[in-house]
A protein has these predicted regions:
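Structural motif
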Residues: 1-5
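PLD/PLD-like phosphodiesterase catalytic module centered on the HKD motif
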Residues: 7-184
């Protein structure tokens, strides 16, 4: 799910509920003090970000968007079971924020069962999510003083990185099962 502004309390309550549903959230900026979604380990959050000079060696130069005042996220859509045989794509002008739900003149389309459209939206969501998640992790680790480039995010030995992908309680295992299971 994408959020261009704030995350309304209705969505916060749903996202904070502990369950086994894997959910990815990408938002234009970090969570505000009034926003809380981090109670469930199956909610993976990424905030839009711009890495300054030297933040990541050997990456392409970052460029901002001079046209739009939303610095990182402009698309607004929600995907429910996007890899299933009956996906749900919700998209339109609404930001899923309180004003967009209650007072603004917004529109939304709900597309159900169109696997081609869901695949296209899911591909775009994962592209945007991965782009910002990497930057978000760099920012969080730097803020926590854990920005040692020798610490190694990628492990060389299979035995060092593979086990979490097969631990049923692990996010990595849930993600592996979701992306590799046959459509339902």
């Amino acid at each position: 799910m994408t959020f261009a502004f704030n995350i309304d309390t209705v969505f916060q309550q749903v996202l904070s509920a502990d369950n086994d549903v894997l959910r990815h959230i990408v938002k234009d900026d970090p969570l505000g003090e009034e926003e809380s979604i981090a109670h469930d380990r199956d909610v993976i959050f990424a905030a839009g970000g711009y890495l300054g000079e030297g933040a990541l060696a050997n990456f392409l130069t970052e460029r901002s968007n001079p046209v739009n005042r939303n610095r990182y996220i402009h698309n607004k859509f929600m995907l429910v079971d996007p890899l299933s045989d009956d996906p749900l794509v919700i998209t339109g002008s609404a930001n899923f924020s309180r004003p967009s739900q209650r007072t603004n003149d917004e529109n939304m389309l709900i597309l159900r069962g169109n696997t081609r459209v869901a695949d296209i939206y899911f591909g775009e969501f994962m592209r945007v999510f991965d782009h910002h998640y990497a930057r978000y992790l760099v920012r969080v680790l730097t803020d926590e003083g854990r920005s040692d480039p020798e610490a190694g995010y990628l492990k060389e030995n299979t035995s060092d990185w593979l086990p979490p992908h097969f631990n049923p309680a692990s996010y990595k295992s849930k993600r592996r099962r979701y992306f590799t299971s046959p459509k339902k």
